[in-house]
Curated annotation (Swiss-Prot):
The gene is iolE. Its cofactor is glutathione; Co(2+); Mn(2+). InterPro entries: IolE (IPR023952), IolE/MocC (IPR030823), IolE/XylAMocC-like (IPR050312), Xyl_isomerase-like_sf (IPR036237), Xyl_isomerase-like_TIM-brl (IPR013022). The keyword Cytoplasm does not apply. Belongs to the IolE/MocC family. This is Inosose dehydratase. Keywords: Cobalt, Lyase, Manganese. It catalyses: scyllo-inosose = 3D-3,5/4-trihydroxycyclohexane-1,2-dione + H2O. Pathway: Polyol metabolism; myo-inositol degradation into acetyl-CoA; acetyl-CoA from myo-inositol: step 2/7. One of its GO terms (biological process) is inositol catabolic process. One of its GO terms (molecular function) is myo-inosose-2 dehydratase activity.
Length: 298
């Protein structure tokens, strides 16, 4: 289905230890995490909070297991803080990822975000940017995009539940306001379906701008509970809203077909944050790997 040497398969460490709720998977070590990723048949991962920041140490640990770093999340605060604060941290993050050989930097605006707040209802309290904040976001992303390109990297914007860029309309607005040469898109199946969007619409419309893909599935019965009981994003995660591809309600056949027939070249990263005490990370990594092999031939 996919052209040879176009796709690398990664998996996010958030299934082993949750960055937003470190108590989930606190017992799982960095070495266990990356060893199980390799055993499950993945080529790389994104960066978690237990990963060494010393690039020499990190490279050695990964090379022993034939793994690479695909990318790492970066929180921007362009709508709520002076741009200099975001830029200073971004440059450090960019240089770290450049040293690790990554090609894309995952960015997500966290100004007014409720994704990390345990008791704030996800759908009821979703943030909405003002026009002034949209302008700050677009201008700031252009600046970060130029900084990334100084080292041969691209920024990929992660639309995300509980943030100001979550819905189809918000993704379209961001894409309309930004330069395709400077700002690319991260396509995340799970966040789109969770929000009630049509993922294939976004995939088709912005195919040429998508430079990173997160493969995530949804347990619809949990999403329904989240809406009915006005739960937060973190409560949704703890209750199992997300799972690996093939274990939920999302149909991936068309997603894979569209991407296979495109010029997409890069990473597919399985990102399915759930409680590792309830969903063994290694077992679910194997499930995901088997599903991707069967459905995408990768």
């Amino acid at each position: 289905m996919f052209k040879e040497n176009t796709i690398k398969l990664g998996i996010a460490p958030i299934a082993w230890t949750n960055d937003d709720m470190p108590e989930l998977g606190a017992e799982n070590t960095f070495e266990q995490c990356i060893s199980e990723m390799a055993l499950a048949g993945f080529n790389g991962s994104e960066v978690g909070n237990k990963y060494p920041r010393n690039t020499v140490v990190l490279k050695k640990s990964l090379e022993l297991r034939n793994l690479e770093i695909a990318s790492a999340w970066f929180s921007t605060f362009l709508t709520t803080k002076p741009i200099e604060e975001t830029v200073e941290e971004f440059i450090k993050h960019r240089d770290f990822l450049h040293d690790m050989g990554a090609k894309v930097i995952v960015v997500s605006e966290q100004g007014h975000s409720i994704q990390g707040l345990m008791d704030v209802p996800l759908f009821k309290n979703k943030p909405v940017f003002t026009e002034e904040e949209w302008d700050k976001l677009a201008d700031g992303l252009h600046h970060l995009g130029k900084l990334a390109q100084e080292k041969g990297l691209h920024i990929v914007y992660h639309h995300h539940m509980g943030t100001g860029v979550q819905t189809t309309a918000e993704i379209e607005k961001l894409m309309d306001m930004t330069d395709p040469e400077l700002v690319s898109l991260l396509f995340d199946t799970g966040h789109l379906v969770f929000s009630g969007e049509e993922p294939l619409y976004i995939l088709k419309k912005y195919l040429s701008r998508i430079k990173h893909v997160h493969l995530k599935d949804i347990r619809q019965e949990v999403v329904d509970i989240v809406k009915e009981n006005e739960l937060s994003f973190l409560q949704a995660v703890k209750n199992g809203a997300f799972t690996v591809p093939g274990d939920g309600v999302i149909g991936f056949d068309k997603v894979f077909t569209i991407l296979a027939n495109s010029d997409y070249k890069g990473w597919f990263v399985v990102e399915a944050e759930q409680d590792p005490a309830l969903a063994n990370p290694f077992e679910y990594a194997l499930k995901a790997r088997k599903f991707i092999q069967e459905k995408a031939g990768l």
